[in-house]
Amino acid sequence: MSESVDSVELFTDGACKGNPGPGGWGALLVCKGVEKELWGGEANTTNNRMELLGAIRGLEALKRPCEVLLVTDSQYVMKGINEWMANWKKRGWKTAAKEPVKNADLWKALDEQVNRHKVTWKWVRGHIGHHGNERADQLANRGVDEVRGYKQS
């Protein structure tokens, strides 16, 4: 009997105070009604790097290949994965202007994770009350706060 593939919803977000500055990423995984919260941060980063890390860390947390609905409010992540990445790879991680792709280290890591799973991408507008997106935003801000030395109670 073949093992069934789990369906997972993954809500991701990034936050940065200063851009560049202290930043955080958040990921909320939902599988079979169970939620898992992930977050982290870096002292000197950008919002785009944190958006990417939210997606990467969420996908990395999955122990085996899954069907993933990845929900983000980041146009940067959506356009990168759906429009730009194929050409970046063809050009050896260069832009159309022959410049190195910004955040190529993270785009490569995301590409590796996406290839482990069957990912469907969904963009949602941020800060309009979407439960999963709001939780991911709170987690990303927790990551910022921890980097800045604030503790959550």
Curated annotation (Swiss-Prot):
Mg(2+) 2 binds at D13, D137. One of its GO terms (molecular function) is RNA-DNA hybrid ribonuclease activity. Mg(2+) 1 binds at D13, E51, D73. GO terms for biological process: DNA replication, removal of RNA primer. Keywords: Cytoplasm, Endonuclease, Hydrolase, Magnesium, Metal-binding, Nuclease. Its cofactor is Mg(2+). Signal peptide: none annotated. It is found in: Cytoplasm. The keyword Metal-binding applies. Its main location: cytoplasm. Belongs to the RNase H family. Endonuclease that specifically degrades the RNA of RNA-DNA hybrids. This is Ribonuclease H. It comes from Pseudomonas fluorescens (strain Pf0-1). The lineage of its organism: Bacteria, Pseudomonadati, Pseudomonadota, Gammaproteobacteria, Pseudomonadales.
